[in-house]
Amino acid sequence: MIEFGNFYQLIAKSPLSHWLETLPAQIATWQRDQHGLFKQWSNAVEFLPELTPYRLDLLHSVTAESETPLSEGQLKRIDTLLRNLMPWRKGPFSLYGINIDTEWRSDWKWDRVLPHLSDLTGRTILDVGCGSGYHMWRMIGAGAHLAVGIDPTQLFLCQFEAVRKLLGNDQRAHLLPLGIEQLPALNTFDTVFSMGVLYHRRSPLEHLWQLKDQLVKDGELVLETLVVEGDENTVLVPGDRYAQMRNVYFIPSALALKNWLEKCGFVDVRIADVCVTSTEEQRRTGWMVTESLADFLDPNDHSKTVEGYPAPLRAVLIARKP
């Protein structure tokens, strides 16, 4: 059973304490409405051993090592339980010699984002749409005091809790199975990340306002999303699908997105990075065995999706709440 009591205790004496007015009731509702496979996934987490790493590297990767190697039987059991939580999309993780080779090389994204961030040391961070929580561990490695992730996908919660259990039940990062629309205006986080979320929102400007409502004054927003080439008036609104995804609504140019942020009241907005997504960064692996990016691109022209739209191009924008 995945519990949230430790998080409630953690924030009770922090600037996030007012969240406790609504959060426990929301979690209780979520616990009543769990997905049919959730029990199977949570059992996999429960059966994992709680291991405390002898060496833990969150600065350069997410790598845990033991002082003495685990037995072949222990490794096989852990590997089997972790594979019960497939597909693994965001990572990679190296846990006591088990290498979870995820669909996405999320470490590459982190390497692109990190040089543009304000120092994370001592910061309280919100990661919206955090997936398995990979980037939260990297935030902790970069010095963050607390990383809170929200993602309503129940499998991602179980993946996060599995990794946490193998990292000595580390309490510096927490994942809550909520969407951004379920959060009150907390105005508490020093840094808010929204990476790979905006294009899934039917109302992208509303999403930007929701992100702003979570930041303290002078807090920093890190926004990473799909963009298209073009001027400040360019926005792609795909038809039924984009790269086989049905839930893609608005893909602006980086310049248009900068304007959107400024319209929502952000200042010091800058385009930090623009990068084509490669089939080396997102691909099928032994831990994610279904279709991936190569299957979503035109086989004769990788500059286009199978629907004929421009292939995925991703931008990182940094902004400040005044």
From Swiss-Prot:
Catalytic activity, as annotated: carboxy-S-adenosyl-L-methionine + 5-hydroxyuridine(34) in tRNA = 5-carboxymethoxyuridine(34) in tRNA + S-adenosyl-L-homocysteine + H(+)
EC assignment: 2.5.1.-
Domain of life, per lineage: Bacteria
Keyword Cell division listed: no
Gene Ontology MF term list: transferase activity, transferring alkyl or aryl (other than methyl) groups
Entry keyword Transferase: yes
Sites where the protein binds carboxy-S-adenosyl-L-methionine: K90, W104, K109, G129, D151, P152, T153, I180, E181, M195, Y199, R314
Pfam families, A to Z: Methyltransf_9
Subunit structure: Homotetramer.
Designated name of the protein: tRNA U34 carboxymethyltransferase
Origin organism lineage: Bacteria, Pseudomonadati, Pseudomonadota, Gammaproteobacteria, Enterobacterales
